[in-house]
Amino acid sequence: MSEDFNPWTHVSSLIERAGHLLQLDEGMIKRIITPERILEVAVPVRMDSGNVEMFTGWRIQHDTSRGPGKGGIRFHQSVNVDEIAALSADMSIKCAVVNIPYGGAKGGVRVDPTTLSPAELERLTRRYAFSIAPVIGPETDIPAPDVNTDPQVMSWIMDTITMLRGYSAPGVVTGKPLAIGGTLGHAGATSLGVTICTLALLKNLARSPENERVIVQGYGKVGSPLVKLLSERGMKVVAVADVKGAIHVPEGIDPDALARHYGEAGTVVGLAGSDTVDSDQFWSVPSDIAIPAALGGVITEKVAETITASVVVEAANGPTTGEGAAVLHERGVPVVPDVLANAGGVVASYFEWAQDLQGYMWEKELFHQRLEKTMHEAFDAIWIRHGELGVNLRETALAVGVERIAEATRLRGLFP
């Protein structure tokens, strides 16, 4: 991805293109593109040394025509307003694609969290939460974990808002530990959503999952459970990559053996019975389905030209560059876009929020049942519209998301 790439300009152009495909008027397109609120905050933090350091944070609510804002909080040294704005728009589209009653939001602080002590991280989190407190809440905007944030960070945010408001507010964030209002089933929800979309695509292509060869790039929070889920459904995961390298087992990787090995070695490399694959050759491993489940921008034009898989399912956020997507389209390789494929995570957040508001927690079986239903319905709607619009699945998903936002905006009208 080039240094002059602007994520906000890119996302805006995608929404504009979807609007033109739907023949929306320019006024509606501009309303959908323009963020509703951009909050920039100063985040002073007293460091362990006694000095006070200044950081900058943001919370952006892109669109709330369909419900409260929803989107993660990231702590990273590269965070900027254009990135957060683009991600908030992505969340608007994603929530509309899976048809849950949320709009899109995103937040972040420009900081390298690896340089902070645990105490400094807590102070940073609480001060940031205090600064954005006027614009977040169960009925307005519900943050969640993202890059370098986790259930502990969500716990600190929830506690800070609870102290400010004088009553318990578990629904102010999702992705919390079970002990304070988290939900059974949240862990692995993104991976389950990816699996459901993969199976749905195979069904619509009249292909059986049995013995479909899959390669998975990434063995973290998404990739690890994904390998097991795909294997349980009859597919053969023949190659897996992580940051330290990649392995290939033509007859299929034993997911339990891989999990044990990874727990001991900290990498997939070296699994007994596997061949080591150079990272630049990973996408060329003979396969039927390729699933990027780690970084963005990995399926470049060059990779797209050499990838052997006949299907791509995007478990990561933005794993395919514009040039790579164009090549895959030219080659006739269907791609289930990230805005649909990895939406299981935000659906899980919606379920957690609903349980917090009800004060009634579901059993894991009910959680999974409702997640599968939601993802199946979302995929089916995209597939049907894909046939009607005559464009690829990525453009169709964007169009469906924009169409649903436009409908809500039109119905609500303009105040005053």
Please report, for each region that a protein language model flagged, where it lies by residue.
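Conserved active-site and cofactor/substrate-binding residues in soluble primary-metabolism enzymes
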Residues: N6, H10-S13, V79-D82, L116-R127, ...
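Short, Gly/Pro- and small/polar-rich lid/capping loops
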Residues: S2-A42
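Glycine-rich phosphate/diphosphate-binding loop of Rossmann-like nucleotide-binding domains
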Residues: K176, G182-P286
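Adenosine-phosphate binding glycine-rich loop
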Residues: S2-F5, L201-L202, T306-P416
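Rossmann-like adenosine-cofactor binding region
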Residues: G245-V335
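Glycine-rich, N-terminal phosphate-binding loop and its surrounding beta-alpha-beta segment
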Residues: E40-P113
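Glycine/serine-rich phosphate-binding loop and adjoining beta1-alpha1 elements at the start
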Residues: A96-E210
